[in-house]
Amino acid sequence: MTEMSIIELFEVGTTFESSVGEGTKSERARIPKNYSRIDLPQNMIEEITNIDSEINFLVSGEIWCPDYQLNATVLKKFCDLNTNFNISIITMARGKKFLSPILKIEKEKFKGPTIVVMDKDFNILGFFEERPKTVKENTFEDIKLDYYKGKYLLDTANEILDIIKTHL
């Protein structure tokens, strides 16, 4: 197979739970810990729950990756808050091979997780790559510990919500 459409990629993907199930015991244990650290303000929770459009999230990432463990868990929270949201997970290899050309990202520069936000017709609204912008704007070594402790999960939530709101 030389190409896959965004819809084919979404359909071949797995659930968040299945992707987590592929991890080691310690990798799996980080998910509920990270989930419990997602402290969304009430107004954001209301914004998310009040979105009445279907939103599809295609994630290229894998459970062994700490960035995936943190940022894909934010999507899980979004999906738990709003049943109009769907999530599908594909491997990094599939993302590099098939998703990177769709997003016009060089394969060598493709990072995980890459989270593609789409409408109900699979039109791409935008994407989030690897870490929130606030983390990328800092010297990673200076904030690494806070990042891995989940102190930037709200930044991820804001970026993803901004992509959705820009297109509603």
Task: Put a short name on every predicted segment.
Residues L58-E62, L75, N84-F98, M118-K120:
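Thiol-based oxidoreductase modules, predominantly thioredoxin-like and allied folds used
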Residues E46-L81:
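Local sequence-structure signature of Cys/Sec-based thiol-disulfide redox active-site neighborhoods
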Residues M1-E54, P101-K111, K120-L168:
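Non-globular targeting/processing and membrane-anchoring segments
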Residues L81-N82, T166:
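Secondary-structure boundary elements
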